Amino acid sequence: MTDNKIYWDQLKKTDPRFTKRINKGFGEITTIDPQWQIGKMTEVFGPVGIGWGYTVQYTYTEQLVFAEVSIWTEAYSNIYGPVCSVQKLWRKTGALDDEAPKKAMTDAMTKALSHLGVSADVFLGMFDNSKYVEKVAAEYKSLNKSKVTEMKGNT
């Protein structure tokens, strides 16, 4: 037996409280709160900038912004990426979308983190199964209760 999936197994389950179902025009997808993903990486690897981190490279055209994100863990030599995402710089109204770089970066980061196993259950389509989501929600609820009890015991 190897430890090849040690991190994947710690990162794969997503707390349903930090997901949203949205319609993208081609069907519904589950989105994941990026702050939750950052918290999950911090839980497993330590603080951003110490146990893990990311780099972002932006490229702009007249109409688009591209964000290339690379993720590193434990040592900067353990790096994955870049993973790219693109967003339109202009809204349909003709106004500049000043959130476009952030949207591109967040999407690229989510994609890069998925390769490490973060929220693998969402990307594997398991959130399309309501029984699975209920089971994971119950697991997280129980885990959160035990953390609250532990915190009360330490005060």
Language model feature labels by segment:
Residues M1-P34:
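N-terminal, Lys/Arg- and Ser/Thr-rich interaction peptides
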Residues T2, I6, Y132-T155:
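Interfaces that engage single-stranded nucleic acids at replication/repair/recombination sites
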